[in-house]
């Protein structure tokens, strides 16, 4: 049980692990979808290629889009690309690294579908049965061109009366299936060789740029996630204070109207609504959340965060972004331990 808990915490704390898990899940779903798909070629001259190529390419496109939607870093990458520069310069290398990472994970499921379709051969036979050169097969010598086209269109349908138990149909189908499997295994081998070379040759080169881009791409993702969590915490605290303020104002209104008398005619004192002390949680890093206490301040803070990200320098002087909003991190006292989950 402890091992499962540690594994779950690892997936929670690592965005790359989550994205890799989603990538593997999409690949497994792709295999299941293809194995359960009912393939029915129309066996018509002008529709075989459309059906076969559509089945070969359309599901991979849908899986590619699903991979982009499931990957949170795709949205973070676009936001980093389109954000105003503000006080933080934009590094094209980080954006390229994030784009490469997103595309690699999004292309996994489409490649699985295409390779399965090529190794199975049904889509390829349906798509290219009408494009086979009849001169490669001796059985078409006594047929007219129209008969040859009709016969080739019926090749994927082995139960059709025109091609049932026909040696020519078996020869054409076997030829196309072998060609499809050869292409599938060639693509698989090329992908394995490319992955092997990338994995083995990468340590031979300078890793400085790679480590820097990987670090800052993770930073951009974690920064946005922590900002969202901090906004949620501030919204909760702000709502709590607004509710307390509402009850306090209602108490004052009840006092003004003289509605505090009990049934016996004596005056009843309403208990005071406790106001949140200003110094509450000052040592836990939450005191800075209470400085933003109006809708105008919240709107300005969010606008400033989008239009002018703070510089990546914690030693910079506060108030760089204008408006008196300081983006300087609160200083931690010596001996303070940082928990595994950041307190935001």
Swiss-Prot record:
InterPro entries in alphabetical order: CALHM
Reaction catalysed by this enzyme: ATP(in) = ATP(out); Ca(2+)(in) = Ca(2+)(out); Na(+)(in) = Na(+)(out); K(+)(in) = K(+)(out)
Topology feature Extracellular, residues: 37-48, 125-176
Q: Which domain of life is it from?
A: Eukaryota
Q: How does it sit in the membrane?
A: Multi-pass membrane protein
Q: In which tissues is it expressed?
A: Specifically expressed in circumvallate taste bud cells.
Task: Mark the residues modified by lipid (S-palmitoyl cysteine).
Answer: 99, 200, 204
**A GO cellular component annotation in the UniProt record:** basolateral plasma membrane
Q: Its Gene Ontology biological processes?
A: ATP export; ATP transport; protein heterooligomerization; sensory perception of taste
Q: Which residues lie on this side of the membrane: Cytoplasmic?
A: 1-20, 72-98, 203-344
Q: Note whether Ribosomal protein occurs among the keywords.
A: no
Looking at the record, which segments are called Central pore? 9-36
Q: Spell out where the chain is glycosylated.
A: 142
Q: Which family does it belong to?
A: Belongs to the CALHM family.
Q: What does this protein do?
A: Pore-forming subunit of gustatory voltage-gated ion channels required for sensory perception of sweet, bitter and umami tastes. With CALHM1 forms a fast-activating voltage-gated ATP-release channel in type II taste bud cells, ATP acting as a neurotransmitter to activate afferent neural gustatory pathways. Acts both as a voltage-gated and calcium-activated ion channel: mediates neuronal excitability in response to membrane depolarization and low extracellular Ca(2+) concentration.
Q: How does it assemble?
A: Associates with CALHM1 as a pore-forming subunit in a hetero-hexameric channel complex.
Question: Per its record, how is this protein called by name?
Answer: Calcium homeostasis modulator protein 3
Gene (UniProt): CALHM3
């Amino acid at each position: 049980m402890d091992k499962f808990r540690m594994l779950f915490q690892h997936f929670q704390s690592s965005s790359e692990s989550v994205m890799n898990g989603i990538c593997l899940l999409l690949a497994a779903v792709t295999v299941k979808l293809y194995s359960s798909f009912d393939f029915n070629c129309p066996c018509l001259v002008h529709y075989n290629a459309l059906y076969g190529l559509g089945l070969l390419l359309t599901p991979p496109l849908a899986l590619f889009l699903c991979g982009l939607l499931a990957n949170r870093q795709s949205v973070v990458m676009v936001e980093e690309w389109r954000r105003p520069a503000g006080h933080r310069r934009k590094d094209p290398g980080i954006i390229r690294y994030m784009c490469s990472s997103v595309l690699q994970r999004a292309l996994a499921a489409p490649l699985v579908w295409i390779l399965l379709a090529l190794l199975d051969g049904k889509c390829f036979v349906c798509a290219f049965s009408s494009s086979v050169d009849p001169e490669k097969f001796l059985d078409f010598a006594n047929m007219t061109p129209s008969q040859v086209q009709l016969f080739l269109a019926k090749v994927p349908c082995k139960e059709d009366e025109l091609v049932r138990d026909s040696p020519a149909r078996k020869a054409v189908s076997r030829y196309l299936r072998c060609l499809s499997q050869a292409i599938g295994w060639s693509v698989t081998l090329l992908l394995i060789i490319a992955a092997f070379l990338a994995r083995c040759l990468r340590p031979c080169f300078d890793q400085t740029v790679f480590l820097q881009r990987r670090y800052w791409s993770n930073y951009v993702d974690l920064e946005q996630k922590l900002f969202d969590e901090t906004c949620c915490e501030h919204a909760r605290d702000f709502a709590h204070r607004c509710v307390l303020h509402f009850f306090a104002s209602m108490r004052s209104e009840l006092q003004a109207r003289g509605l505090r008398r009990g049934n016996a005619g004596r005056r009843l004192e309403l208990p005071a609504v406790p106001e949140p002390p200003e110094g509450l949680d000052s040592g836990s890093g939450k005191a800075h959340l209470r400085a933003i206490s109006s809708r105008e301040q919240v709107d300005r803070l969010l606008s400033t965060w989008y239009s002018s990200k703070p510089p990546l320098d914690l030693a910079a002087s506060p108030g760089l972004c204008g408006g008196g909003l300081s983006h300087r991190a609160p200083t931690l006292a010596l001996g303070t331990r940082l928990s595994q989950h950041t307190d935001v």
